[in-house]
Amino acid sequence: KRLLADLGIQINEVIPEGGSVNQLKNLPKAWVNLVPYREVGLMTAIYLEKEFGMPYISTTPMGIVDTAEWIHQIEFYINKLAPNILGYKVNYESYIDQQSRFV
C-alpha cells in the first residue's frame, strides 16, 4: 500500500482483506487489478478480465527486479488507460532508480 501511495495511486479495494459483499460492487471501478500473490486472487482477476475487460498484473513485487517490473506494468496500464482522464502520462523510472540506487 505504501509503494502505491508513493506513486500517487489510489487503491479502490483490497479483497479479501476485511472485505464484505457490499465492497464487491466497487471492483469494476478499478483500472487494473493487482494480484501480488497468485495463490490468492488470481481466479478473481481472470474473471474480472473476462467479464469487464479489466486487465490484471500478477507479478509478485518481491525483490528489486520483480518490484521494478511490477511498477513498469502498472505504469504501462495507467498510460494505456488513463492519459485522457489524467491529462498526462506517468513515468515511474526515477522512483525505481531512487529506490534501488543503493542496494
UniProtKB/Swiss-Prot annotation:
Domain of life: Eukaryota
Subunit annotation: Protochlorophyllide reductase is composed of three subunits; ChlL, ChlN and ChlB. Forms a heterotetramer of two ChlB and two ChlN subunits.
Protein name from the UniProt record: Light-independent protochlorophyllide reductase subunit B
Cofactor: [4Fe-4S] cluster
Family according to the record: Belongs to the ChlB/BchB/BchZ family.
Free-text comment on the cofactor: Binds 1 [4Fe-4S] cluster per heterodimer. The cluster is bound at the heterodimer interface by residues from both subunits.
Location(s) in or outside the cell: Plastid, Chloroplast
One Pfam family in the UniProt entry: Oxidored_nitro
EC number(s) per entry: 1.3.7.7
Catalytic activity, reaction form: chlorophyllide a + oxidized 2[4Fe-4S]-[ferredoxin] + 2 ADP + 2 phosphate = protochlorophyllide a + reduced 2[4Fe-4S]-[ferredoxin] + 2 ATP + 2 H2O
Functional note: Component of the dark-operative protochlorophyllide reductase (DPOR) that uses Mg-ATP and reduced ferredoxin to reduce ring D of protochlorophyllide (Pchlide) to form chlorophyllide a (Chlide). This reaction is light-independent. The NB-protein (ChlN-ChlB) is the catalytic component of the complex.
Entry GO terms, CC: chloroplast
Endpoints of the signal sequence: none
Gene Ontology MF terms in the entry: 4 iron, 4 sulfur cluster binding; ATP binding; metal ion binding; oxidoreductase activity
Keywords: 4Fe-4S, ATP-binding, Chlorophyll biosynthesis, Chloroplast, Iron, Iron-sulfur, Metal-binding, Nucleotide-binding, Oxidoreductase, Photosynthesis, Plastid
Pathway(s) it belongs to: Porphyrin-containing compound metabolism; chlorophyll biosynthesis (light-independent)
InterPro entries: ChlB/BchB/BchZ, Nase/OxRdtase_comp1
Biological processes annotated in GO: light-independent chlorophyll biosynthetic process; photosynthesis
First-listed, main subcellular location of the protein, grouped into a coarse class: plastid
